Amino acid sequence: MEIALEKTNDINIIALKGRLDVTTTANLDQTFAKLFESEGAKILVDCAELDYISSAGLRTLLAAAKNSKKQSGKIVLACLNQNVKQIFEISGFTQIFEIFDSRGSAAAAL
């Protein structure tokens, strides 16, 4: 999996590409840890090129959401493809995360 990190204004954008599973979650954990060094981090996770997410990937996102909330930050997700969106729906994660169809609408929610 590839992780691209960029910052636009005060929003940290994490773009995921490939598969997020048990073999790749450590890299995403490190990325989140770096961002959580700042209190109140605003994070947009762009999933446009995320092909698959496993339960390990879901746990990573859930842990990040909890850490973000503790630090008065916020995480939103954008551009989930149909397969990934279905995994979020089946697992109930659509109730946990704010999910948007575009980066622009996700950024506006931050």
Where are these regions (language model features)?
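Short acidic-hydrophobic, aromatic-tinged amphipathic segments that line or gate anion-handling sites
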Residues: 98-102
